[in-house]
Regions:
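Short solvent-exposed coil/turn linkers within tandem alpha-helical repeat scaffolds
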Residues: 39-46, 75-85, 99-100, 115-116, ...
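Short coil/linker segments at helix-helix boundaries
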Residues: 62-68, 94-124, 163, 167
Length: 231
């Protein structure tokens, strides 16, 4: 009828993508969203398709594609209302979820474990939190960063323990110092200090040993429970 809006092919692709995502058919959704991006790059749904591609790739366990899509969106649309989402997903997709960092090795040098993805994710989520302190995704990003921070620290100290076990004290000191200097709020700080204490004692570094013991004692005192208030 006159005045009735005719549905355009672009919208057909977009609606198809929504149906496919709603049914967890992310392969199909990616196909539909990429069709919009390729066939209608300046159309009504082009920008929305690009941002939803980030999500679809991520949910399809294609973390590299999700990261690339996020970077592309940031580059093309730096002032888009959903730009915070792109930064958030960029950081989230850097971390490969199926990686097991804590497998016990018997004869393997565990200092060779690759945690570059985790470090990149931590850095990118930190950038997101700095840029968008009021974003709706802030709370999740903070929780993820706490998890990543502790994971990175645990991995560094697993390597430090390995170095200590083979009397490679300088390597152990380097790893423990990395945790103290770069991940100061992790749950592993006390353990890092104890590794330094053991290494300094083994090397006969009396002044450094005294310094680190002072810090350890101060942490112990901080963690002591306080007496109850008088009523």
């Amino acid at each position: 009828s006159d005045g009735e809006e005719i549905e355009q092919p672009e919208k057909i692709y977009y609606d198809q993508a929504q149906r496919r995502m709603n049914s967890n058919n992310f392969n199909g959704a990616i196909e539909s969203l990429e069709a919009i991006e390729n066939m209608y790059p300046f159309g009504k749904y082009a920008e929305q398709a690009q941002v939803e591609l980030i999500y679809a790739h991520f949910m399809n366990s294609e973390t590299e594609a999700a990261h690339s899509s996020a970077e592309k969106f940031i580059r093309l649309h730096p002032r888009h209302p959903n730009i915070d989402y792109a930064y958030f997903m960029k950081g989230l997709s850097s971390y490969t979820r199926d990686r097991d960092l804590f497998i016990r090795f018997s004869d393997t040098d565990i200092s060779n474990r690759d945690i570059s993805g985790e470090k990149q994710s931590f850095a990118e989520l930190t950038e997101f939190l700095t840029r968008f302190p009021d974003s709706q995704y802030v709370q999740y990003a903070k929780q993820r960063n706490v998890y990543l921070r502790n994971m990175i620290a645990k991995n560094e100290l697993a390597a430090a323990d390995y170095y200590y076990s083979i009397n490679a004290y300088v390597g152990a000191i380097r790893r423990a110092n990395y945790v103290i200097e770069n991940i100061p709020n992790s749950s592993e700080n006390y353990r890092a200090l104890k590794i330094l204490e053991n290494c300094y004692e083994a090397l006969g570094y009396s002044e450094l040993l005294e310094d680190v013991r002072v810090i350890i004692l101060s942490l112990i005192h901080i963690s002591e429970p306080t007496r109850p208030l008088h009523i």
